[in-house]
């Protein structure tokens, strides 16, 4: 365990968060927090908004670490199996940001793609009762958690949507299988595999996500 007094927290840049509603229109709406994949940025997942329930306000975050032309939530490491500590450092930063806006929103959901999908699941591990759901698209669950978080999440069994393509060349099959097994054991999971889909999001997948989120 990392001593709390020395723990690094990667803070979210509040000034670059992308919103689908203006400041005067957000209060009272459910909030969907979205997290992009490695090498992308806060604008990437805004394109999903028209396909998702319009009652939700979408807030798209920028990962805190520069990575090429974009940003990363944590060092890449072994695909699908990153080191745990840097992930938790970014999770702490996202939780701090969520706490700063939570009072305006009756429900908060999480959605991430690829590395952002791993963040969504790790945030749910941190606060099993704190979110309406987590959606992980072409993502994975981070291995190595041994501190009781999975016992806590199993007791709550929050809602999770897993979407992945059967032709994904980025996320190893072992990581996908590990994620499916973890979600089945610890959450109320909706698990979908999309035939012919690479490391991407399809229209059919988005329709399933929209139905899962609901109004």
Model-derived regions, located:
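Short alpha-helix in the alpha/beta-hydrolase fold that links the catalytic acid
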Residues: 45-48, 149, 172-182
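A conserved short beta-strand
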Residues: 129-142
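Acidic catalytic loop of the alpha/beta-hydrolase fold
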Residues: 143, 166-172, 199-200
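C-terminal catalytic histidine-bearing segment of alpha/beta-hydrolase fold enzymes
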Residues: 174-215
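Gly/Ala-rich beta-loop-alpha elbow adjacent to hydrolase catalytic centers
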Residues: 111-116, 120
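Serine-hydrolase catalytic machinery in alpha/beta-hydrolase-like enzymes
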Residues: 8-107
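Short beta-strand/loop motif that positions the catalytic acidic residue
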Residues: 156, 161-164, 168
């Amino acid at each position: 365990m990392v001593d709390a007094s020395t723990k690094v927290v990667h803070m979210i840049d509040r000034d670059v968060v992308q919103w689908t509603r203006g400041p005067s229109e957000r209060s009272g709406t459910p909030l969907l927090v979205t997290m992009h994949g490695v090498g992308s940025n806060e604008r990437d997942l805004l394109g999903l908004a028209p396909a998702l329930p319009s009652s939700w306000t979408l807030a798209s975050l920028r990962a805190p670490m520069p990575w090429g032309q974009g940003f990363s939530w944590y060092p890449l490491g072994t695909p699908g199996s990153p080191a745990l500590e840097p992930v938790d450092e970014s999770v702490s930063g996202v939780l701090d940001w969520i706490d700063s806006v939570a009072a305006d929103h009756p429900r908060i959901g999480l959605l991430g793609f690829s590395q952002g999908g791993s963040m969504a699941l790790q945030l749910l591990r941190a606060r099993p009762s704190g979110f309406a759901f987590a959606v992980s698209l072409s993502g994975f669950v981070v291995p190595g958690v041994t501190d009781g978080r999975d016992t806590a999440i199993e007791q709550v069994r929050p809602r999770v949507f897993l979407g992945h393509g059967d032709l994904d060349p980025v996320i190893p099959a072992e990581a996908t299988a590990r994620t499916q097994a973890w979600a089945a054991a610890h959450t109320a999971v909706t698990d979908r595999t999309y035939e012919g889909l690479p490391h991407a999001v399809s229209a059919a997948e988005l329709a399933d996500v929209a139905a899962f989120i609901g109004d």
